[in-house]
Amino acid sequence: MAILETRDLKYSYPDGTVALNGINFKAEKGEMIAILGPNGAGKSTTFLHFNGILKPSNGSVILKGEAIKYDNKSLLNVRKTVGIVFQNPDDQLFAPTVEQDVAFGPMNLGLSKEEIEKRVKDSLKAVSMEGFERKPPHHLSGGQKKRIAIAGILAMNPEIIVLDEPTSGLDPMGASQIMKLLYELNRQGITIIISTHDVDLVPIYANKVYLLNEGKIIKGGTPREIFSDSETVRSANLRLPRVAHLIELLDKEDKLGIKMGYTIGEARNNIKEFIKGE
């Protein structure tokens, strides 16, 4: 049984603009999933349905086998299970200090002071931000803010964390650090779902990919299954990972016949095999 899925999910804005048109998505427990698509594809709108921030115009969102209900009590339980980290951490961080910000969610669960303190401590440790408890969030770097936003979600002990463009606005090192953090959280059993248009990150970290364009899922599968269909990827205003594009050119333009690879490590091994075989 999927831990989270949508069935024929449709959503229109109040002015009648169709944002989502029949989204069928499925996440199994423990997966790390990337929803890949260009700007305006509907990725953020899809994510806002995953924990009930938005209510579908038609269709349903199924969490652990049950359709989400939209009364306050039901939504509180949904948001204990599914945590969302917004693209811009400034939309999420509002308390005077890091400690207060991370404690906000657990406080609203009515937990004891001791349990709240434990969750704050454990969450900050998990994102390598111990020692920042008294810092004002607005004094932090972009990468640090992302970590604090993730810590605030971790403090709720979710089973699923959904992150909208988690590497947006970060330099290459900061983006790599955030993705390694998410990979480690996934190894600990948390289901991770990210949206991105960074095609180079996807084959490194994701084990399932959905390609979204114009409010529709146009393809789903493993990274290899997605990127081997270069025509569909490009029809969504995306591209192959750089290393895959290089091998594609070596094959089509230079007739070298090197086996396709979608990460640097995979491509390196394939090029070495090709050289040895000459």
Curated annotation (Swiss-Prot):
GO cellular component terms, A-Z:
ATP-binding cassette (ABC) transporter complex
Topological type in the membrane: Peripheral membrane protein
Pfam families linked to this entry: ABC_tran
UniProt entry tagged with the keyword Protease: no
Coiled-coil region = none
Q: Which UniProt keywords apply?
A: ATP-binding, Cell membrane, Membrane, Nucleotide-binding, Translocase, Transport
Q: Can you say where in the cell this protein is located?
A: Cell membrane
**InterPro entries from the xrefs?**
AAA+_ATPase (IPR003593), ABC_transporter-like_ATP-bd (IPR003439), ABC_transporter-like_CS (IPR017871), ABC_transpr_CbiO/EcfA_su (IPR015856), Co_trans_ATP-bd (IPR005876), ECF_ABC_transporter_ATP-bd (IPR050095), P-loop_NTPase (IPR027417)
Catalytic activity, EC: 7.-.-.-
Which Gene Ontology molecular-function terms are recorded? ATP binding; ATP hydrolysis activity; ATPase-coupled transmembrane transporter activity
Biological role stated in the UniProt entry: ATP-binding (A) component of a common energy-coupling factor (ECF) ABC-transporter complex. Unlike classic ABC transporters this ECF transporter provides the energy necessary to transport a number of different substrates.
Q: What does the annotation say about its assembly with partners? A: Forms a stable energy-coupling factor (ECF) transporter complex composed of 2 membrane-embedded substrate-binding proteins (S component), 2 ATP-binding proteins (A component) and 2 transmembrane proteins (T component).
Q: What is this protein called?
A: Energy-coupling factor transporter ATP-binding protein EcfA
Task: State the encoding gene.
Answer: ecfA
